[in-house]
Amino acid sequence: MKKISSRQEIREQVKKWQEQGLTVALVPTMGCFHQGHLSLIKKGREIADRLIVSLFVNPIQFGPGEDLDAYPRPYEKDSRLAEELGTDVLFCPETTEMYGPNFQTNISVTTLTADLCGAGRPGHFDGVATVVTKLFHLCQPDFAIFGEKDFQQLAMIKQLVIDLDFDLQIISCPIYREDDGLAMSSRNKYLNAEQRLKALCLSQALEVAKDYVLARSAAGKTIESDEVITKARGVIIDAGYEPEYISIVDQQTLEPSPTVQPGNVMALAVRIAERIRLIDNSALLT
């Protein structure tokens, strides 16, 4: 595995591959790999001739008071795992390499980022869209692989690819969960034992919602989204938390759906502690 930290070098490497007619997959990450990340890397290895994993903690997607400084950075461990899974290039630029001293450009995908996580994290998705755009330009991938846990981010990136005419395919991979159902996240490392147990309320709320929807559907009844949200909210309240949001939306437009329809997704966010905010989502009717 080759480690590259400069924009010029990654461009040169990709150009060599392209001249050989090789396809390229990109897995953008902020590091601190868990099994969810590794599933993305494995998928990239399966579908392309060459695989780039980017490892960059992107400062412009963190808001004031968020965990940029505390965000875990186990670089050596991440590097070893990427190499073990057959990564060809680990692209690990410094912040000053990605963003020059006079950097002024901001990419914004407006409508898709207005609600859900976007409502409580102003500027976050602009930061994600900007760094992803730069990575797409630098790495010129044929495929880019993202996880479905960051449901709103995935929808935004798909729209970004359409709007900016990127010649690449977005591949999504399912949420990777712990044995007890908790969606894997780099921020799970922050949880103490009590918080870790209570954090199960996210996946439990989704299961309660799905069970309710399936029962109503089997009975041939209309399923009001507000009823389902109330059921899910009760699970989170019982765990001692107030959800930041719970919403049932169209999986492509992210528009709220007044009644549950096939393909709708329930997405939710809960702040477990001051700097520990977890998200999860699930389709309700397939």
Curated annotation (Swiss-Prot):
Listed Gene3D superfamilies: HUPs, Pantoate-beta-alanine ligase, C-terminal domain
Gene Ontology CC annotations of this record: cytosol
Record keywords: ATP-binding, Cytoplasm, Ligase, Nucleotide-binding, Pantothenate biosynthesis
Location within or outside the cell: Cytoplasm
GO terms (BP aspect): pantothenate biosynthetic process
Sites where the protein binds beta-alanine: Q61
Catalysed reactions, semicolon-separated: (R)-pantoate + beta-alanine + ATP = (R)-pantothenate + AMP + diphosphate + H(+)
Principal subcellular localisation of the protein: cytoplasm
InterPro entries: Cyt_trans-like (IPR004821), Pantoate_ligase (IPR003721), Pantoate_ligase_C (IPR042176), Rossmann-like_a/b/a_fold (IPR014729)
A Pfam entry, by short name: Pantoate_ligase
Pathway: Cofactor biosynthesis; (R)-pantothenate biosynthesis; (R)-pantothenate from (R)-pantoate and beta-alanine: step 1/1
Residues the entry annotates as binding (R)-pantoate: Q61, Q153
EC number(s) given by UniProt: 6.3.2.1
Active site positions: H37 (proton donor)
Binding site for ATP: 30-37, 147-150, 184-187
GO MF assignments: ATP binding; pantoate-beta-alanine ligase activity
Family: Belongs to the pantothenate synthetase family.
Note: The reaction proceeds by a bi uni uni bi ping pong mechanism.
Subunit structure: Homodimer.
Function per UniProt: Catalyzes the condensation of pantoate with beta-alanine in an ATP-dependent reaction via a pantoyl-adenylate intermediate.
Protein name stated in the entry: Pantothenate synthetase
The gene coding this protein: panC
